[in-house]
């Protein structure tokens, strides 16, 4: 689990095949290696990846073909700089929100507006994903925990403070760029519970009417 608070900006140095459909993603980094162990989880632009090698200058991760297909890592036009966050430890403060590191979709940046020292960034997203986004709710953009300032059926806006804009790769984004999006997991749990509630209404099980209809 992650919190969406970025620790460091790294740079992708290579993606290479390890054989048997396994890929290795190597990121140049300086600080996240502190207390790192093989097998640790790190969110790389919001994607949970497993550490398979590291030294003082870089970290390598295992990358499945499916992850390559469903993320922007294989996009040559995508930024080579990435947000990095180590997995949350027991007892850490939850400064952002619960981020799993499972990307739901891509969103496209359509507008950036500077208002004083703050920034408003507008994105378009598939309506099937937008239904999980709520006003003033949380969303992870490239792994960054952000708050929804406005939304419609296929669009949302985030308001970004200067520190977040400067200390993450948000400042690198240009209109037309795509980003990884992970919606708040709580919305998906609510949807799942409601689905079961509807099933129970359609099939209520043993009721007084059921017993009467069966001669009891």
Which sequence ranges carry the predicted segments?
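Conserved loop->alpha-helix
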Residues: 1-216
